[in-house]
Design a protein with these regions (language model features):
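Surface-exposed, low-hydrophobicity beta-strand/loop segments enriched in small/polar/acidic residues
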Residues: 1-145
Length: 145
C-alpha cells in the first residue's frame, strides 16, 4: 500500500536526493531496480489496487508520477517525491533552460515539452540539465498523484 509522508517528514539525511521543505513523499513497492533520480510510473501490469501501490521506471506515457529518491532493488520499498522540489532528477539531455516544461521520456527520464505534445506536464526545470548520459537537473514537480 502506498504510504503518504506529507510535508517532508523524513530527514534529508534519510534520502539520497535533496527535496524542498514542501515536498510530498509517498512510499511504494517497486517491481524493478530503480536508481535515485529516476522518474517512476504506476505499474499497470498489476491488477486491482496494486496498480496504484506499485511503481516501475517511467516511460514516455501518462503513468509517470514522481522521482525516486533512493536507489533500490526490485521488490523493495522506494520513497517517491510526487510534488515539490527535487535535486538531480533524470533528464534526456534536452532541457535547455530554467522554466522548461517537462514531459515523460523513455528510461526513467523526462524531456523538454513542446506545444504539440500530448503527454502530461510533470513539472518544470529549475536549471539546464548537466552531465553526460544520463543527464540530471533540479526540478519542481507538479502534483499528479
Amino acid at each position: 500500500m502506498a504510504r503518504y509522508d506529507l510535508h517532508h517528514a523524513k530527514s534529508p539525511l534519510e534520502v539520497s536526493i535533496v527535496t524542498g521543505q514542501g515536498a510530498e513523499i509517498v512510499e511504494f513497492t517497486t517491481n524493478e531496480a530503480l536508481t535515485a533520480g529516476d522518474w517512476v510510473g504506476l505499474d499497470t501490469s498489476q491488477s486491482n489496487e496494486d496498480r496504484v501501490t506499485q511503481v516501475v521506471q517511467g516511460n514516455a506515457d501518462g503513468m509517470v508520477i514522481g522521482v525516486a529518491l533512493e536507489t533500490v532493488a526490485s521488490g523493495a520499498v522506494v520513497r517517491v517525491c510526487v510534488s515539490g522540489y527535487v535535486e538531480g532528477a533524470k533528464t534526456d539531455g534536452n532541457v535547455a533552460a530554467a522554466g522548461d516544461t517537462l514531459i515523460p521520456a523513455a528510461s526513467g527520464a523526462v524531456t523538454k515539452g513542446a506545444a504539440t505534445n500530448v503527454l502530461p506536464i510533470l513539472g518544470m526545470a529549475l536549471e539546464v540539465d548537466a552531465g553526460s548520459d544520463p543527464y540530471y537537473a533540479d526540478v519542481y514537480i507538479y502534483r499528479r498523484f
